[in-house]
Amino acid sequence: MFEGQPKGLWALALANTGERFGYYTMLAVFILFLQANFGWTSGTAGTVYSSFLACVYFLPIIGGAAADKWGYSKMVTIGIFVMFLGYLLLSLPMGADIPAIVVMVAALLLVSLGTGLFKGNLQVMVGDLYNDPKYAQKRDAGFSLFYMLINVGAMFAPTAAIKIMDWAQLSLGISKSDSYHFAFAVACVSLIVSIAIYYLFKSTFAHVLTTDKAAVEKNTKELEEMAPAETKERIVCLCLVFAVVIFFWMAFHQNGATLTYFARDFVATSATGVTAMEMDVTNLVACIFIVYSLCGIFQNKGKGKIIPAVLIVAAVAYLSYNYMNVTEVEISAPIFQQFNPCFVIALTPVSIGIFGWLAKKGKEPKAPVKIGLGMIVASIAYLLMTTTTMALPAPDAVNPKHLADVNPNLLVTTYLILTFAELLLSPIGISFVTKVAPTKYKGIMMGLWFGATAVGNFLVSIPTMLWGNEHYVVWGTLMCICLVAALFIFSIIKKLNKVS
């Protein structure tokens, strides 16, 4: 899985990991901060949250166009510094009056702009690593690994947010509403780490940088010119995929919206036994070690199996010790956001292994089929939520209160299913864009991928506005949206497979 990948992949992935750690630390508590600090309703907080996400994913369109003109590396560097300024403003406690709202909006715009310059362009650079015929067959696996490392940062983010807030409240006597700003400050530190990694290991991916406009024009002329009809066909197919992506992200990013509301209002606030262990990120890391070590045993021969076997024994011993000493733990709503990235990391080698095995047999489904399957799997997650919450009382959207003690594993299972969907759609979709997009439109096409994600994230607010209705209304709506999107993509699958 890790062998035969270009060295630049690891440098770019780790630089992105640092940035994503900060972003998800902020995002883990953001919607709760809006309600705690400003006293807004679930619908209002959800609208602000989804509008921010929309900006984060819309501005890569501008970032992609700028990179096509001035170069990817320059835009990535500028993006990191702009994001840093945004997170710095968010980390300042300003109260809850009009000036505080103005500063928050300015900070969110800076974070969005910086992300727009950074995120998409970094991923285009990753795609360009695989233009070398030596690595061409490893493109999908490479993007899956890239996506996995992003989630390393995301997995630790909720715990970091909760721990830093608890420390601020207990050790410094900071109020809960002001302690959120300490979580936002973590993002500033993570960006310093990110830019350091980017420049320290720049030599590993320097050959894909297009900072010289003259060089870009020269290389473009040297490339075989694609026929206008083929260019049009590829762009149309990409736009059709973008249309489906909108509805996936609308459903998926409920993890920071209605699913977080559900965790706060309906999930048990404490746990014991195995469930309590699930809430500790170190136990999740031990489980990940077991998965990767099992993969190592299957892949290696002879003495190569010894180290993975030792790691499995050590991880099992660690988990056994923790189980014998586990006590009741309190459950905070943001902690559930650690499960999706944990599952991404754990399941990535499984996903790569399955599709690698199918590829050897000549039966690996093409990217559009994987995307359609991802939408079906996402609908199953919300089918689970629909059927298991029918007996619960309707939530209070205006004055949030704890109304039930649902088993936390309902949400854990939902996140697991959504992760299966994500692995089928997100890294595969990004790989599809870098493969299918005409060379001279790569930057703008990657930007449009994020633009579609932006629209989906803006639509995240619709279920938050439904919050307050019966549960089957909220979750059933999301289930139906995913199913319709799946039917659409399978109805045009021949057209999409043609350009794959």
Language-model region placement:
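C-terminal ends and interior cores of transmembrane alpha-helices
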Residues: 79-99, 316-326, 356, 373-403
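Central cavity-lining transmembrane alpha-helices of secondary-active solute carriers
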Residues: 47-68, 155, 338-355
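Intracellular loop-helix junctions on the cytosolic face of multi-pass helical membrane proteins
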Residues: 1-6, 131-140, 162-328, 351, ...
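Cytoplasmic membrane-interface "Motif A"-like loop-to-helix N-cap segments
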Residues: 68-83, 137, 299-308, 357-376
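Symmetry-related core transmembrane helices of the 12-TM Major Facilitator Superfamily/SLC fold
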Residues: 105, 178-200, 373, 472-494
